[in-house]
Amino acid sequence: MSDHIQFKVEALDIKAMRYYTPGDYEVDKDEALLRVTVTTMPYVSEMAVALHEIVEATLCRVAGITEKEVFDFDQMWNEEQGHLYGEEPGADLRAPYRDQHLKAEEIERLFVEAAGMDWQEHCQNVEGSM
């Protein structure tokens, strides 16, 4: 595990994402590179989602939650039936990274507000990118 990490942020079409999500991250085997991918959307929303992913990944690492645990839970959640439109796997009570996801969302909201964008507009941008 590296004490230093590099970030790489990319905006991709939803079809190029690992699964159906507006934001994702992967950590390399040495944990020296955090690759964050977001769906293509207006700049402030792209940066807000990227920030969310960076914060969530960092908090998970500090808590000892692996990227594989997050990915596996997200995959399981996405395969389940009956989730409402707009729900996210990280907000599910069963998510091993729920606390980290919710903290990342708080910071995402603060960023969106500081950038002068309404939260509902940001949510529409995210939904429109998928």
Regions picked out by a protein language model, each given a short descriptive name:
Residues A48-C60:
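Active-site recognition of the HExxH zinc-binding catalytic motif
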Residues M1-M47, R61-M130:
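Metalloprotease/metallohydrolase-associated module, dominated by Zn2+-dependent proteases
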